[in-house]
């Protein structure tokens, strides 16, 4: 039986106070007329690959990269595969549904998710559809791959597991959601036979990997305010495991570090984070909801540096590349900072003003050893290289690694005449019936023992 540690909510109040919401958003900070020119940028190639997010901000489309191939989703349902060397189109597949997230890969399959809750597996070499299945609700976060399973949090709060070899459902757990939520969800992370997610109530939940029984509930943000917007404390940034630190961050809440084995809270700092984070050499890089960049020491939570040059410019999640921290903004600029001290090193205009929709960049940037892969909101995909002589670095990419477990070598296509019926575009607050029901947890917060062992 898995050991449980019980703790009451008041003990956490001192460090889990949520910040006030921004009812009146200031205008974006104007760009400097004479920015630093300490970064050298080269566009290696660019390719028109569909319609991007279709001008709709709730479509979190971004490329994925594996086996020298770039996989690009689009709001209109088109999926592309490009050669990393020159951007040449290898294949394209009309999935027949509105793709809404960054795909993930396993063996020879690329897993795409849609706003209608459809999961589609496509062969990475020839673009053939391998299988298709339905999730409980809209998919707004990248599917997580571990061993031969796909783990997913959908917008209705459900957490589900699917067999990556054929798309069959392994288990699904329904969870309540607040009155209003952000149009995004955090991806699950797998740790010690537990599927862990951050939910829209600002809590970390854990489920047994085999059956979906809920064993962990740790709040990292507490709602305040009178309006539904003021009470929003969604966890939408993907959790990160680095050494023995498990990092979660919430909107209008906090960024926290938990011990990966005991579940003990090591530190918590007030923050408001929506986008994914980056980690390198023991430093966590974040973009706050007001587009301030902030770096934290992973051991203590102390601030390493802050940078407010781009406040309110709707910048993307940060990435680490060649000693630089790189973000993009709503006007299609790339911005470069020294990862050691936050010094602003310059910008580069990637998209042109003639681009339709926003001509900006809002999706996740993807660093690779060949360059940074970028899908602009208008559907143009780029491979960009950048470096600065003011930055010294040991490796092109960060030292953060994602454990995908062990999977089969190949996934084969299923015989399907037509796509299965999708669910409604956006989930309501209604709790859905699922195969596995979550265990009720009321007044007491349950913090699970994260130590290794088979699930109970």
From Swiss-Prot:
Give the highest taxon in the source lineage. Answer: Bacteria
Report quaternary structure and partners. Answer: Part of the Bam complex.
Q: Which SUPFAM superfamilies match?
A: Quinoprotein alcohol dehydrogenase-like (SSF50998)
Q: Which GO terms describe its biological process?
A: Gram-negative-bacterium-type cell outer membrane assembly; protein insertion into membrane
Which InterPro entries is this protein grouped with?
A: BamB, PQQ_b-propeller_rpt, PQQ_rpt_dom, Quinoprotein_ADH-like_sf, WD40/YVTN_repeat-like_dom_sf
Q: Which UniProt keywords apply?
A: Cell outer membrane, Lipoprotein, Membrane, Palmitate, Signal
Lipid conjugation (S-diacylglycerol cysteine) is at 20
Q: What does this gene product do? A: Part of the outer membrane protein assembly complex, which is involved in assembly and insertion of beta-barrel proteins into the outer membrane.
- Where in the cell? Cell outer membrane
User: According to the entry, what is the taxonomic lineage of the organism?
Assistant: Bacteria, Pseudomonadati, Pseudomonadota, Gammaproteobacteria, Thiotrichales
User: From which residue to which does the signal peptide run?
Assistant: 1-19
Q: What is this protein called?
A: Outer membrane protein assembly factor BamB
Family, per the entry?
Belongs to the BamB family.
Topology in membrane = Lipid-anchor
Residue positions of covalent lipid attachment, annotated as N-palmitoyl cysteine: 20
Q: Which cellular component terms (GO) are annotated to the entry?
A: cell outer membrane
